[in-house]
Amino acid sequence: MRIRVKICGITRLEDAMTAVHHGVDAIGFILWPQSERYISPEEAGQIVRYLPPFVQAVGVFVNPDKSWVEVASAAAGLDLLQFHGDESPDFCSQFHLPYIKAVRVRDGLDLLQYAQCYEGSKGLLLDAYAEGKPGGTGHIFDWKLIPSGLSLPWILSGGLHSDNVVDAIEQTRPLAIDVSSGVEIANGIKDADKISVFMQGVRSCENV
């Protein structure tokens, strides 16, 4: 089965085009101004213009105002919303675009119940938990905490890079994976060689 890939934290057109060249399915833009990988909606929109058909533009938000989501998604030309904070199901589902909900996985969190709460989403993005950080920690979490029988599709995230992505896929068999810092040379600056090696690892796991 083909594994979907999103490269997140894109800030440069050249990095987006490199990702597209290597067959990614989605490009993620951090639309949370406090992030070191923040990009303005207008700048994101200039990149989205060059994305080919079937490559999704995903906007990442953290506890935003409704108006910010509406303005930013329109200016950037987004296809999908990703909520990475404490947004409620009602908040996430009020927009005209589909969404995925990030969850920071840790001991004691009932992912089965969480999935039921966000049943209107297109899926859950499973990320590592770190106190006071909504995401982008660069750390993995204990993949054994992922239960079988989740009612939603899910995306594996958190600390993935070329040295662990094969193990991650073999152990968890996700629908999709999400990477950011694992293919960077600096915050928001991707590395073409790292993207290439990472994608080779992903593709080696398909049809196995």
Curated annotation (Swiss-Prot):
Disulfide bonds: none annotated. It holds the Pfam family PRAI. SUPFAM superfamilies: Ribulose-phoshate binding barrel. Transmembrane segments: none annotated. Pathway: Amino-acid biosynthesis; L-tryptophan biosynthesis; L-tryptophan from chorismate: step 3/5. Keywords: Amino-acid biosynthesis, Aromatic amino acid biosynthesis, Isomerase, Tryptophan biosynthesis. It catalyses: N-(5-phospho-beta-D-ribosyl)anthranilate = 1-(2-carboxyphenylamino)-1-deoxy-D-ribulose 5-phosphate. It is an enzyme of class 5 (isomerase). GO terms for biological process: L-tryptophan biosynthetic process. InterPro entries: Aldolase_TIM (IPR013785), PRAI_dom (IPR001240), RibuloseP-bd_barrel (IPR011060), TrpF_fam (IPR044643). GO terms for molecular function: phosphoribosylanthranilate isomerase activity. It comes from the Bacteria. Its EC number is 5.3.1.24. Belongs to the TrpF family. This is N-(5'-phosphoribosyl)anthranilate isomerase. It comes from Nitrosomonas eutropha (strain DSM 101675 / C91 / Nm57). The gene is trpF.
